[in-house]
Amino acid sequence: MANTASAIKAAEVALDKGDYNLCIQIIEPLLLSFSERTSIGGQIRLLIVTAYIGIGDEKKAIDICHTLINNKESSIHQQAKQLLSILDAPS
């Protein structure tokens, strides 16, 4: 769990610096370890959604947000719904 926490922190730092590709590299290996229905799984998916938005890959961001609608944490599924409403809005 300590490695996961340090990876999440490193991904957050990468996001803060605008290094979206590094964030994706850090988070992708964790996706298989944590279900989208768990708190940590939701948290890491929200991070990678933000990174995908940052690099302009809205399709991947939308696909992941759809998986988070069923997360057990209301804050995570609410954030996913908010992001979907923004991503699905006409431009």
Q: Which role fits each region the language model picked out?
A:
Residues 49-60, 86-91:
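Alpha-helical linker/edge segments of TPR/alpha-solenoid repeat scaffolds
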Residues 29-37, 69-72:
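Solenoid-like repeat scaffolds
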Residues 66-91:
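N-terminal intrinsically disordered, acidic low-complexity segments at the extreme N-terminus
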Residues 9, 45-50, 82-83:
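"A position-specific structural signal for the A-helix of alpha-solenoid helical repeats
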Residues 3-29:
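Alpha-helical segment of the N-proximal tetratricopeptide repeat
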